[in-house]
Amino acid sequence: MAERRPKKTESFKYKITFKKTGLSRFLPHHNMLSFFERTFLCAGIPVKFSEGFSPKPKIVNMGALPLGMETYCELISVELLKPLDITPENLPNLMKELSRPFPRGMEIVNIEPLKEKLSKHFPKAMVYRYTPEAIPADLMERFNSKTFPTVTNHRGQEMDLNQHVLSIDNQEGTLYIKVKCNDQGTTASPFVIFAGILGISIDPAKLDEVSRRFLVAKVSMEW
């Protein structure tokens, strides 16, 4: 009986780190994943599909980014039917080739073998960057004394910013804030957090408009 079972096709799993900057930060989540499927197709590298009535490419990310936010450390996993040559000598050329079909500002910055599913290892915190027009003189005092306000997110839920902001680093007028992740590896909206700690009035229900006014970037993740 065992011989009658169809043999499983060998596959190769990779973790890909990429960035989205400039106008590509407005690329919707679904379109972004489609670009990855397309770039492997253009390179002649077949992507493995799921089985069943409606097969889908085995490309997985860690959740949709807020529209309009830059990222320098976004992750996806992909399962391929052909191995990639990711030796140190070939990796730069491979990343350049695979990034070629992407819109300007979107680029692969690393490829490595996937050791475990992304859902098995979520980040503990994320670091966001923003350069405001002005920084309140008492910002660090309020952080240290845990007197940041409670604000409302886009779902109408209250958020105590003191429970979310883990650290603040002011580097010549550019703020880097470390924000705690939930158990799914995501954080509260950095737009809402920056607005709250800086005393900027925004409508959390209209974050698409807010993202056009504030250039916030996700620069790193901590595990």
Regions inferred by a protein language model and the residue ranges of each:
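Core RNA-modification/binding signature centered on pseudouridine synthases
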Residues: 8, 142-223
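Short beta-strand-to-loop capping motifs
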Residues: 18-20, 78-86, 130-135, 177-183
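Short, charge-patterned binding micro-sites
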Residues: 48-83
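Short, extreme N-terminal leader segments that mark the start of a protein/domain
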Residues: 1-38, 42
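Ordered, soluble secondary-structure elements with a strong preference for glycine-centered loop motifs
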Residues: 25-30, 85-92, 183-188
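Ordered, amphipathic secondary-structure segments that act as subunit-interaction surfaces
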Residues: 71-127
